Design a protein with these regions (language model features):
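Extended intrinsically disordered, low-complexity coil regions enriched in Ser, Thr, Gly, Ala
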Residues: 16-52, 93-132
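Short aromatic-glycine-(Arg/Gly/Cys) micro-motifs in beta-strand/loop hairpins
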Residues: 1-19, 75-96
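A short linear-motif detector with a strong N-terminal bias
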Residues: 3-6, 31-35, 59-66, 79-83
Length: 148
């Protein structure tokens, strides 16, 4: 059975002073089946990367998530999945903090509204250093697999 995985990859590319991270989404039967795709996803790592965290995405915002084939019929009112990476700051801390989330919504603007309602967005800022959305991507089910 195919599953949708959300994976936090860590790596310290050559010439960098700190470990860096990125999020990878993949569809496979098991996490280890995604290793070749993860390696090609971040070629600058030159194969020297690790998994810092992962989850099988089975439910988002009360919606059950199921991977189906591209040719399967999906209802027209089906919501899409959006990955949002929020960034914010705390007074007297030399760091940009992040909060990653997956939102089920009919459109991108609705997903962004949901992100702006989180405690992170509302409280991780101070004058001159506002919370913001670093990245906002739709997990485009048409380009991967339809998800219901």
């Amino acid at each position: 059975m195919q599953k949708l995985f959300m994976i936090l990859i860590g790596c310290k590319p050559k010439g960098r002073h700190t470990e860096q991270h990125d999020i990878f989404f993949g569809v496979a039967a098991q996490l280890r089946d995604l290793i070749p795709e993860m390696l090609s996803f971040w070629p600058e790592a030159e194969g020297d990367m690790h998994v810092d965290g992962w989850r099988e995405v089975t439910q988002v915002d009360g919606q059950d998530i199921k991977v189906v084939g591209r040719t399967d019929v999906v209802p027209a009112n089906q919501k899409a999945l959006f990955f949002i990476n929020l960034g914010g700051y705390k007074k007297d801390e030399f760091e940009e903090f992040h909060y990653k989330m997956v939102v089920a919504a009919a459109e991108k603007s609705t997903a962004i509204k949901a992100a702006k309602q989180t405690a992170f967005f509302k409280h991780t800022h101070f004058d001159g250093a506002n919370s913001h959305i670093d990245d906002e991507y739709g997990v485009d089910v048409d380009d991967l697999y339809r998800i219901e």
